[in-house]
From Swiss-Prot:
GO terms for cellular component: plasma membrane. Pfam families: G3P_acyltransf (PF02660). The chain crosses the membrane at residues 3-23, 55-75, 79-99, 111-131, 155-175. Belongs to the PlsY family. This is Glycerol-3-phosphate acyltransferase. Signal peptide: none annotated. Residues 216-239 have a biased composition (Basic and acidic residues).
C-alpha cells in the first residue's frame, strides 16, 4: 500500500510540471493559457511558436508519463499499480498543482505512459493518432479517437481486466477535456492543424530581401515576408514618388500648352494726323 501511494504521488507531481508554460516562458512565447486555443499543451504551442517548440513540449509531456511508469516497473509494482501510476501522471498534467490546476488535455502524457506500460499499445495509439490527423487534419479528433481505443487495445494485447479501469478513466478524462472540441467539430468551427513560422524561420526567410537590397542599391525592395497590409503600404509608398513626378510633368505640359494658345498682345498702332491749317 505504501508503494502504491508513493507511486501515485510521484506520478501526479511529475505530471504537474507543465512543460508548455515553462517552454513559452523560457523562449519568450505567448502564454498558452491566454493565447491560441488557451490550452497549455503541445498543439497550442505548435500554433503559437512553431514546430521546434511544439515538438519540444510534446517530448517533455511524453516523458512525464514515461518516467513514473518506468519507476513503477523498476520497483516491481503490480500491473494495476503501474496503470494507476500512469493515471496519476495524466491527472497531474491536466490539473497541475504548480500552475493553479490549469493544465493541458493529457494526450502526449497518456501516449508516453502507454509506451512505457506496454510498448505495442503505445505504438498502436500513436499510430491511430497519426493516421486520423493525417487524413482529417484535426488534432482533437485524432486525440479523441486514439485515446478512446487505448483500453480496448489493452484488452486485446494484455488481457488483464484489472488494468482496464484506470485506462478507461484516462479515456474519460481526455474526452472530458475535449468537450469544447466536440462542439466545434459538430459546428464545423474546429481549426485544423497548421504550422506557424518560428522566429528563426522568419529571420532566415527575411535574408533574401536584404541581399536584394545589397544587389540593387538605390531601388525600392518590397519585403515579401510581411502581411498583406504592409505589402500594400509599401507598394503605395513606391508608387507615390512616381505619381508626383507624373503630376509635375503634366503640370509643365499644361502650362506650355496654355502659353502657346494665348494670342499675342498687339498694341494698336496710332496714326498721328496733322491737320493742315
Amino acid at each position: 500500500m505504501a508503494l502504491f501511494i508513493f507511486l501515485i504521488l510521484v506520478g501526479y507531481l511529475m505530471g504537474s510540471i507543465n512543460s508548455a508554460i515553462i517552454v513559452c516562458r523560457t523562449f519568450g512565447l505567448p502564454d498558452p493559457r491566454e493565447e491560441g486555443s488557451k490550452n497549455p499543451g503541445a498543439t497550442n504551442v505548435l500554433r503559437l511558436g512553431g514546430k521546434q517548440y511544439g515538438i519540444m513540449v510534446m517530448v517533455f509531456d511524453a516523458l512525464k508519463g514515461i518516467l513514473p511508469v518506468i519507476l513503477a516497473k523498476l520497483l516491481s509494482a503490480e500491473p494495476v499499480t503501474v496503470a494507476f501510476t500512469a493515471l496519476a501522471a495524466v491527472v497531474g498534467h491536466m490539473y497541475p498543482v504548480f500552475f493553479h490546476f490549469r493544465g493541458g488535455k493529457g494526450v502526449a502524457t497518456t501516449i508516453g505512459a502507454l509506451l512505457a506500460f506496454h510498448f505495442v499499445i503505445g505504438v498502436m495509439v500513436a499510430a491511430t493518432w497519426l493516421l486520423v490527423a493525417n487524413f482529417w487534419r484535426y488534432s482533437s479528433l485524432a486525440s479523441i479517437a486514439s485515446i478512446s481505443l487505448a483500453p480496448f487495445y489493452s484488452l486485446i494485447l494484455v488481457g488483464n481486466l484489472n488494468i482496464f479501469p484506470p485506462l478507461f478513466m484516462i479515456t474519460i478524462l481526455v474526452l472530458y477535456k475535449h468537450r469544447d472540441n466536440f462542439n466545434r467539430l459538430i459546428d464545423g468551427k474546429e481549426p485544423k492543424i497548421k504550422f506557424k513560422h518560428s522566429v528563426i524561420e522568419e529571420i532566415m526567410e527575411a535574408s533574401p530581401a536584404t541581399s536584394a537590397e545589397q544587389e540593387f542599391p538605390g531601388k525600392e525592395v518590397i519585403d515579401t515576408n510581411i502581411d498583406e497590409t504592409e505589402k500594400t503600404e509599401q507598394a503605395e509608398a513606391v508608387k507615390k514618388p512616381k505619381a508626383k513626378k507624373a503630376t509635375t510633368k503634366a503640370k509643365k505640359t499644361a502650362s506650355k500648352e496654355e502659353t502657346t494658345k494665348k494670342p499675342r498682345s498687339t498694341k494698336p498702332k496710332t496714326k498721328t494726323v496733322k491737320e493742315k491749317e
